[in-house]
Structures are given as structure tokens and as C-alpha cells.
């Protein structure tokens, strides 16, 4: 038996080595990863930075002029923001009050008289009782009274 086990181990090792050789000979080609070319973008950013630096040196000399321009820009933005708020308030005035649902149920535009529908349902199925009926509650109370009488002995 030990001879058979040794032979099996030898065969297994041979299979593994042949399998490894086949893997080595047929290596999958490594996937090429393409690097994005940011060189053009970097050049544009560098140009903008140099312009900004040049603009800063000029703006330091003309600081008062730039401050007044920024104040004007702020005023324009405030005016625009104020106009947007007024438009929203105007939209609220255009809402028709007849479209507002006063009851608690949504009916997707249909006007439903719930009292009439309840009466129609009662006419169609008068034998069906609901949990809200008085008779339903009385049956439960009677059962409880009977149980209590048994325990009072």
C-alpha cells in the first residue's frame, strides 16, 4: 500500500509540474493600462495660474478699483436673489382655491360624496355588519359577564 501511495504522490507532483509548465508557457498578456494624458490640461492650468499671479500683482496696485467692482457684483447678486424670492411669492397667488382638497382623502380630482356611497353600500349588503355597529360590541360584553359569573362562586 505504501508503494501505491508513493506512486500516487509522484503522479500528482508530475501533474502539478506539467500544469505549471503549461501555465508558464501560455502566460496571459498583461492588460495595457492607458494613462490619461493630462499634459494639455496641466499646460492650461499653468497658464491660468500665471495669469492669475500677474493679475494679483496688478490688482494690488489697483486694489480700490477691484473692491468697488466686487461691491457692484455683490449688489447685482443681491438684486437677483431678491427677484427670485418675489417670483416664488407671485406663484403662490396663482393657486386656485377650488383645487384644494379640504377632506382627508385624496380622490384624484373626482368629487365623491361619502355619505351617499355609504348608504348605497348598506342598501346592497344590509346583512353585513361592521365592527363599528353596536350589536358587535354587546356580544363581547355579554361573554365577559358570563365568565365573571363563573368566577364569583
Curated annotation (Swiss-Prot):
GO term, biological process aspect, one: chromatin remodeling
InterPro entries given in the database record: Histone_chaperone_domain_CHZ (IPR019098)
Phosphoserine found at: 68, 70
UniProt lineage: Eukaryota, Fungi, Dikarya, Ascomycota, Saccharomycotina
GO CC, alphabetical: nucleus
Subcellular location: Nucleus
Protein's recorded name: Histone H2A.Z-specific chaperone CHZ1
Stretch list, region Disordered: 1-153
Record flagged with keyword Chaperone: yes
Extent of Polar residues compositional bias: 56-65
Similarity comment text for this entry: Belongs to the CHZ1 family.
Coiled coil regions, renumbered to chain: none
Modified residues (N-acetylserine): 2
Principal location: nucleus
Residue spans of biased composition, Acidic residues class: 84-94, 139-153
Any one Gene Ontology molecular-function term assigned to this protein's record: histone binding
Alphabetical keyword list: Acetylation, Chaperone, Nucleus, Phosphoprotein
